[in-house]
Amino acid sequence: MLSSPEWLALEVKYPDRLTAFYDAFLELDVLEERDGETVLAAGETELRLRAPGDVPRGGLHTHYALTVPDSEYDDWHDQLGERFDLVEHTFGDARSLYFYDPEGNCVELGERPLKAQSSGVTGLFELVLEVEQLDGAVEFYERLGFETVDDGREEGRVRLTTGKFDLELWSPRLGIADARGGVHVDFGVVTDDPSSVAREVADDALSVTSVKDGVRIRDPDGHYVTLVG
């Protein structure tokens, strides 16, 4: 059974410059700096800023969404609106704002009713992957443990979830705020039994590799998902 997201990696030319950007505008602290990569704390999720180099690479032009407390949403909107041409969209009773980082990633901040002590960015709640064959990609991620909750294949998009983390699979297209799904994205998801889950997709995966964190799978579109035990 899949659970919450552990990390999202983005490929960036200069990690130090993007670190400064995310510090200035989203107040994300540095957890770790290593050769060619800086790890930021996006609440409970790691945001890994990775320079071009070895595989797995980080995602390019990746749309992803972070949660903020609903009590702080208006403050974030006002603060970011001074610097960015924001796009806003409402999903039911929840509002989201969209802006771009210097590398062309579309960042979404979505309000959520969170505990009173929660403040700032609290975690990753959505990630969008670009895929070549939507039907096959949906089947792959359903067998991995995601559940389809919004089937918009006619529009070129399908939304799946673990219950704690949403994954959108898009055919090449533009979404809200002209966002795109990421290519060669690298992300981690928590699960109780990485090896057992990996066996469900082993025949169709491009590779399945045991790593320190768990089991790393390369899907048919070249995205890497690590099942973290």
What are these model-predicted stretches?
Residues 1-6, 10-32, 42-86, 100-153, ...:
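Glyoxalase I/VOC metalloenzyme domain signal
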Residues 156:
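Histidine/lysine/aspartate-rich catalytic loop segments that bind and position anionic ligands
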